[in-house]
Amino acid sequence: MGMLQPSHGQYIRSGSQRIMQMVFQDPLSSLNPRLPVWRIITEPLWIAKHSSEQQRRALAEELAVQVGIRPEYLDRLPHAFSGGQRQRIAIARALSSQPDVIVLDEPTSALDISVQAQILNLLVTLQENHGLTYVLISHNVSVIRHMSDRVAVMYLGQIVELGDAQQVLTAPAHPYTRLLLDSLPAIDKPLEEEWALRKTDLPGNRTLPQGCFFYERCPLATHGCEVRQSLAIREDGRELRCWRAL
């Protein structure tokens, strides 16, 4: 998104920055408390100065209807709305510049359970109507299962498994992914003892292991795992950062 510059390496994006937008985790803190909702929704266009105030107001009304906000509420301030309504406003703002990609950073974790499903279903509908690509960041496997076509599992900032959602979520291959999914509550499925984590502290980003980042906590760790791993493609097409899982 360009908000932080990388300390090393590079990232490449195509064309204008407007093709990417973001929906943040906490809708209240991501909305300007002093602006009316219609101004918030069209803020990307106001910054770009590509349209008149009348055009922006009309667009705000159109997007408000799409996300389930009544147009007559557009002159209100953010504090007058519920958490779910604020997130709908944030989604409308992300749509206003007609992006190709929207980054969703834990879009439902700050919301009540009763509202989460509504927001997820809204996102699915908008994706179909606008042809959007989502980059969804979440720790909630149920949300990932509901929303994702492809899944990347990360551990200490590294992708350890990448593949189709069906592959990764039903037949995880990397030891960390297996532990992650096995930790989900299940009535008739106890956690296998041999897959229990070793009693070690989670390393911080200043004291990362020299080899595989998961080496000190992995139940399958053996000689060879102390060597730094890179992503490799398995026969089924998924990418793994574990030589034992290939």
Across the structure, where does each feature detected by a protein language model lie?
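Q-loop/switch helix immediately C-terminal to the Walker
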Residues: 26, 33-47
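Charged, flexible cofactor/metal-binding loops and thiol motifs
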Residues: 164-246
